[in-house]
A protein has these predicted regions:
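A general secondary-structure boundary signal
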Residues: 4-8, 57, 79
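S4-like RNA-binding module at protein N-termini
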Residues: 27-69
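Glycine- and charge-enriched low-complexity intrinsically disordered segments
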Residues: 64-83
């Protein structure tokens, strides 16, 4: 699944367009690297979101096969950010 679609389907961004812009701006990283919005995501990958409050990193446990609720999407991610 494309990174921009995954970010949107996992409810990390409201839309695929917002996700694409964040990826292009370097605010959304895949496995610690800046990649293109079309880069593939697979279970086990780490998605990092960089913002003013710091960086939040999640491990992808599974990818959605259909549209999910926000609560169901949370079940597909595991927070790995050190607190």
């Amino acid at each position: 699944m494309r990174l921009d679609i995954a970010l949107s389907e996992l409810h990390l961004f409201k839309s695929r367009t917002q996700a694409s812009l964040a990826i292009q701006d370097g605010a959304a990283l895949l496995n610690g690297e800046v990649v293109k919005p079309g880069h593939g995501v697979k279970p086990g990958d780490h998605i990092s979101l960089v913002g003013p409050a710091g960086t939040r990193t999640c491990e992808v446990l599974a990818l959605p096969r259909a549209s999910l609720s926000r609560a169901a999407a949370r079940e597909l991610l595991r927070e790995v950010t050190a607190r």
